[in-house]
Amino acid sequence: MARYRCCRSRSRCRRRRRRCHRRRRRCSRRRRRRVCCRRYTVIRCRRR
């Protein structure tokens, strides 16, 4: 399964050449982050 990460803005996602998609179900249940649900998520994003 692909890892999803929060993206604050589309521009940031574009910089990393990643695609941002709006997904509500992709919000991790353990980390209840509304940002992930409301904002954009990056597919195949590496963790820092």
Swiss-Prot record:
Free-text function comment from the UniProt entry: Protamines substitute for histones in the chromatin of sperm during the haploid phase of spermatogenesis. They compact sperm DNA into a highly condensed, stable and inactive complex.
Protein location: Nucleus; Chromosome
GO BP field: chromosome condensation; sperm DNA condensation
This protein's UniProt keywords: Chromosome, Developmental protein, Differentiation, DNA condensation, DNA-binding, Nucleosome core, Nucleus, Spermatogenesis
Tissue expr: Testis.
Alphabetical list of Pfam families matching this protein: Protamine_P1
Main subcellular location: nucleus
An example Gene Ontology molecular-function term: DNA binding
Membership in a protein family: Belongs to the protamine P1 family.
Protein's recorded name: Sperm protamine P1
GO cellular component, one term: nucleus
Source domain of life: Eukaryota
Source organism per UniProt: Murina cyclotis (Round-eared tube-nosed bat)
